[in-house]
Design a protein with these regions (language model features):
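Extended catalytic cores of very large enzyme megasubunits
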Residues: 1-237
Length: 237
Protein backbone atom coordinates (compact mmCIF):
# COMPACT_ATOMS: atom_id res chain seq x y z
CA UNK A 1 0.00 0.00 0.00
CA UNK A 2 1.35 3.38 -1.02
CA UNK A 3 0.34 4.90 2.32
CA UNK A 4 2.96 2.80 4.10
CA UNK A 5 5.90 4.43 2.30
CA UNK A 6 7.52 7.07 4.45
CA UNK A 7 5.71 6.01 7.63
CA UNK A 8 6.80 4.05 10.69
CA UNK A 9 5.44 0.90 9.02
CA UNK A 10 8.22 0.96 6.44
CA UNK A 11 10.84 0.03 9.04
CA UNK A 12 8.91 -2.78 10.71
CA UNK A 13 10.29 -6.30 10.25
CA UNK A 14 7.44 -8.74 9.71
CA UNK A 15 7.10 -12.48 10.06
CA UNK A 16 4.52 -14.53 8.22
CA UNK A 17 2.38 -17.34 9.54
CA UNK A 18 -0.91 -19.11 9.00
CA UNK A 19 -3.57 -18.22 11.54
CA UNK A 20 -7.31 -18.54 12.00
CA UNK A 21 -9.75 -16.34 13.85
CA UNK A 22 -10.68 -19.38 15.95
CA UNK A 23 -9.76 -23.10 16.02
CA UNK A 24 -12.56 -23.96 13.59
CA UNK A 25 -11.86 -21.17 11.12
CA UNK A 26 -9.78 -21.86 8.00
CA UNK A 27 -6.26 -20.44 8.41
CA UNK A 28 -5.18 -17.46 6.36
CA UNK A 29 -1.76 -16.00 5.67
CA UNK A 30 -0.99 -13.06 7.94
CA UNK A 31 2.10 -10.96 8.65
CA UNK A 32 2.78 -9.37 12.03
CA UNK A 33 5.79 -7.63 13.61
CA UNK A 34 8.55 -10.19 14.12
CA UNK A 35 8.65 -10.06 17.96
CA UNK A 36 4.89 -10.55 18.36
CA UNK A 37 3.52 -13.91 19.48
CA UNK A 38 1.32 -16.15 17.34
CA UNK A 39 -1.82 -15.04 19.20
CA UNK A 40 -1.41 -11.62 17.61
CA UNK A 41 -1.61 -13.30 14.22
CA UNK A 42 -4.86 -14.95 15.24
CA UNK A 43 -6.23 -11.57 16.30
CA UNK A 44 -5.24 -10.05 12.96
CA UNK A 45 -6.90 -12.94 11.13
CA UNK A 46 -10.10 -12.17 13.03
CA UNK A 47 -9.98 -8.41 12.47
CA UNK A 48 -8.85 -8.17 8.85
CA UNK A 49 -11.69 -7.94 6.31
CA UNK A 50 -12.19 -10.83 3.92
CA UNK A 51 -10.39 -14.15 4.05
CA UNK A 52 -7.24 -13.61 2.02
CA UNK A 53 -3.70 -12.73 3.09
CA UNK A 54 -3.38 -9.81 5.50
CA UNK A 55 -0.46 -7.82 6.87
CA UNK A 56 -0.74 -5.64 9.96
CA UNK A 57 0.61 -2.50 8.24
CA UNK A 58 -1.79 -2.73 5.29
CA UNK A 59 -4.86 -3.61 7.36
CA UNK A 60 -4.20 -0.94 10.00
CA UNK A 61 -3.27 1.69 7.44
CA UNK A 62 -6.55 1.11 5.62
CA UNK A 63 -8.69 2.22 8.56
CA UNK A 64 -6.25 4.95 9.54
CA UNK A 65 -6.45 6.43 6.05
CA UNK A 66 -10.25 6.22 6.14
CA UNK A 67 -10.29 8.18 9.39
CA UNK A 68 -7.90 10.79 8.00
CA UNK A 69 -10.09 11.34 4.95
CA UNK A 70 -13.30 11.42 6.97
CA UNK A 71 -11.85 13.85 9.49
CA UNK A 72 -10.76 16.25 6.78
CA UNK A 73 -14.01 15.93 4.85
CA UNK A 74 -16.06 16.73 7.96
CA UNK A 75 -13.80 19.60 9.00
CA UNK A 76 -12.76 17.76 12.18
CA UNK A 77 -9.09 17.82 11.13
CA UNK A 78 -7.50 21.10 10.12
CA UNK A 79 -5.64 20.13 6.99
CA UNK A 80 -2.98 17.63 6.06
CA UNK A 81 -0.72 18.25 9.06
CA UNK A 82 -3.48 17.53 11.57
CA UNK A 83 -4.49 14.43 9.65
CA UNK A 84 -0.94 13.12 9.56
CA UNK A 85 -0.48 13.84 13.27
CA UNK A 86 -3.54 11.72 14.03
CA UNK A 87 -2.30 8.95 11.74
CA UNK A 88 1.21 8.95 13.22
CA UNK A 89 -0.21 8.69 16.73
CA UNK A 90 -2.44 5.76 15.79
CA UNK A 91 0.37 3.91 14.02
CA UNK A 92 2.64 4.33 17.04
CA UNK A 93 -0.11 3.19 19.40
CA UNK A 94 -0.77 0.02 17.41
CA UNK A 95 2.93 -0.86 17.12
CA UNK A 96 3.52 -0.24 20.84
CA UNK A 97 0.42 -2.36 21.54
CA UNK A 98 -0.93 0.39 23.74
CA UNK A 99 -4.41 0.29 22.28
CA UNK A 100 -6.61 -0.66 19.36
CA UNK A 101 -10.09 0.08 18.05
CA UNK A 102 -12.93 -2.40 17.88
CA UNK A 103 -13.64 -4.68 14.94
CA UNK A 104 -16.15 -2.24 13.45
CA UNK A 105 -13.35 0.24 12.73
CA UNK A 106 -10.92 -2.39 11.42
CA UNK A 107 -13.59 -3.80 9.09
CA UNK A 108 -15.33 -0.49 8.28
CA UNK A 109 -18.74 -1.84 9.26
CA UNK A 110 -21.71 -0.01 10.67
CA UNK A 111 -21.84 0.28 14.42
CA UNK A 112 -20.81 2.36 17.38
CA UNK A 113 -17.04 2.68 17.51
CA UNK A 114 -15.01 1.65 20.52
CA UNK A 115 -11.40 1.79 21.57
CA UNK A 116 -9.55 -0.18 24.25
CA UNK A 117 -6.23 0.77 25.85
CA UNK A 118 -3.82 -1.95 27.01
CA UNK A 119 -2.71 -1.03 30.54
CA UNK A 120 0.52 -3.10 30.84
CA UNK A 121 1.88 -1.37 27.73
CA UNK A 122 2.09 1.86 29.74
CA UNK A 123 4.60 0.47 32.23
CA UNK A 124 7.71 2.60 31.86
CA UNK A 125 11.39 1.72 32.00
CA UNK A 126 11.71 3.05 35.54
CA UNK A 127 9.17 0.58 36.89
CA UNK A 128 6.30 3.07 37.06
CA UNK A 129 3.16 3.88 35.12
CA UNK A 130 3.53 6.41 32.30
CA UNK A 131 0.54 8.58 33.17
CA UNK A 132 1.35 11.40 30.68
CA UNK A 133 1.50 8.89 27.82
CA UNK A 134 -1.75 7.34 28.99
CA UNK A 135 -3.46 10.73 29.05
CA UNK A 136 -2.21 11.43 25.54
CA UNK A 137 -3.51 8.04 24.39
CA UNK A 138 -6.93 8.80 25.85
CA UNK A 139 -7.02 12.11 23.99
CA UNK A 140 -6.02 10.43 20.74
CA UNK A 141 -8.72 7.79 21.07
CA UNK A 142 -11.41 10.37 21.84
CA UNK A 143 -10.47 12.29 18.70
CA UNK A 144 -10.49 9.05 16.71
CA UNK A 145 -13.90 7.98 17.99
CA UNK A 146 -15.29 11.44 17.36
CA UNK A 147 -14.25 11.21 13.71
CA UNK A 148 -15.57 7.65 13.42
CA UNK A 149 -18.95 8.90 14.67
CA UNK A 150 -18.96 11.74 12.12
CA UNK A 151 -18.86 14.22 14.99
CA UNK A 152 -22.41 13.23 15.95
CA UNK A 153 -21.97 10.48 18.56
CA UNK A 154 -23.82 11.12 21.81
CA UNK A 155 -21.31 9.03 23.77
CA UNK A 156 -17.87 7.58 23.16
CA UNK A 157 -16.88 4.04 24.14
CA UNK A 158 -13.37 4.20 25.56
CA UNK A 159 -12.13 1.51 27.91
CA UNK A 160 -9.03 -0.23 29.20
CA UNK A 161 -7.97 -3.87 29.38
CA UNK A 162 -5.66 -6.22 31.30
CA UNK A 163 -5.78 -4.61 34.71
CA UNK A 164 -4.47 -7.96 35.98
CA UNK A 165 -1.35 -7.57 33.84
CA UNK A 166 -0.72 -4.07 35.17
CA UNK A 167 -1.16 -5.24 38.76
CA UNK A 168 1.19 -8.16 38.15
CA UNK A 169 3.81 -5.71 36.95
CA UNK A 170 3.77 -4.17 40.42
CA UNK A 171 3.40 -7.44 42.30
CA UNK A 172 -0.12 -6.61 43.51
CA UNK A 173 -2.69 -9.39 44.08
CA UNK A 174 -5.78 -8.92 41.92
CA UNK A 175 -8.22 -9.27 44.83
CA UNK A 176 -6.38 -6.92 47.20
CA UNK A 177 -7.40 -3.51 48.55
CA UNK A 178 -4.39 -2.03 46.78
CA UNK A 179 -5.67 -3.41 43.48
CA UNK A 180 -9.06 -1.76 44.03
CA UNK A 181 -7.33 1.57 44.63
CA UNK A 182 -5.30 1.20 41.43
CA UNK A 183 -8.44 0.36 39.44
CA UNK A 184 -10.24 3.41 40.81
CA UNK A 185 -7.30 5.64 39.97
CA UNK A 186 -7.01 4.26 36.43
CA UNK A 187 -10.74 4.82 35.89
CA UNK A 188 -10.41 8.39 37.16
CA UNK A 189 -7.39 9.08 34.98
CA UNK A 190 -9.17 7.66 31.94
CA UNK A 191 -12.32 9.65 32.46
CA UNK A 192 -10.51 12.88 33.29
CA UNK A 193 -8.24 12.67 30.25
CA UNK A 194 -11.12 11.74 27.96
CA UNK A 195 -13.37 14.50 29.24
CA UNK A 196 -10.58 17.04 28.82
CA UNK A 197 -10.25 16.11 25.16
CA UNK A 198 -14.03 16.10 24.76
CA UNK A 199 -14.03 19.61 26.19
CA UNK A 200 -11.41 20.70 23.70
CA UNK A 201 -13.48 19.31 20.86
CA UNK A 202 -16.62 20.95 22.24
CA UNK A 203 -14.88 24.32 22.33
CA UNK A 204 -14.10 23.99 18.64
CA UNK A 205 -17.16 22.20 17.30
CA UNK A 206 -19.87 22.48 19.94
CA UNK A 207 -20.83 20.07 22.71
CA UNK A 208 -22.35 16.86 21.37
CA UNK A 209 -21.17 13.80 23.30
CA UNK A 210 -20.05 12.49 26.67
CA UNK A 211 -17.58 9.80 27.65
CA UNK A 212 -19.39 6.61 28.66
CA UNK A 213 -17.30 5.54 31.64
CA UNK A 214 -18.31 4.86 35.24
CA UNK A 215 -15.73 6.49 37.45
CA UNK A 216 -15.33 5.94 41.20
CA UNK A 217 -13.63 8.65 43.24
CA UNK A 218 -9.86 8.12 42.99
CA UNK A 219 -8.03 7.30 46.24
CA UNK A 220 -5.57 9.65 47.89
CA UNK A 221 -2.69 7.29 47.16
CA UNK A 222 -2.05 3.98 45.42
CA UNK A 223 0.73 1.42 45.37
CA UNK A 224 1.75 2.85 41.98
CA UNK A 225 3.69 6.07 42.62
CA UNK A 226 2.11 9.17 41.13
CA UNK A 227 -1.00 7.42 39.78
CA UNK A 228 -3.51 8.86 42.25
CA UNK A 229 -2.10 12.36 41.78
CA UNK A 230 -2.34 11.99 38.00
CA UNK A 231 -5.96 10.82 38.28
CA UNK A 232 -6.97 13.76 40.46
CA UNK A 233 -5.20 16.20 38.15
CA UNK A 234 -6.95 14.73 35.11
CA UNK A 235 -10.38 14.96 36.74
CA UNK A 236 -9.70 18.56 37.78
CA UNK A 237 -8.53 19.65 34.32
Amino acid sequence: MAGIVGTIWAGVALRRLKAGADPDAPPRAVAIPAPWEDEAGEALAALAPGGGPATLPSVAEAWIQRLMLRGRRLGLLDGADAAESLAAGLRAMILARRGAPGAEIWRDTRGEGRFVLNLPAFLDGAGGFDAPAYRAACALTVQTLDIWGHGKAESLRLGFADLAGLLAGFGLPYDSHEACDVAAAIAGLTRGAAEAESGRLATRFGARHAVALICPTPPEETAIPGLAKAARAALAA
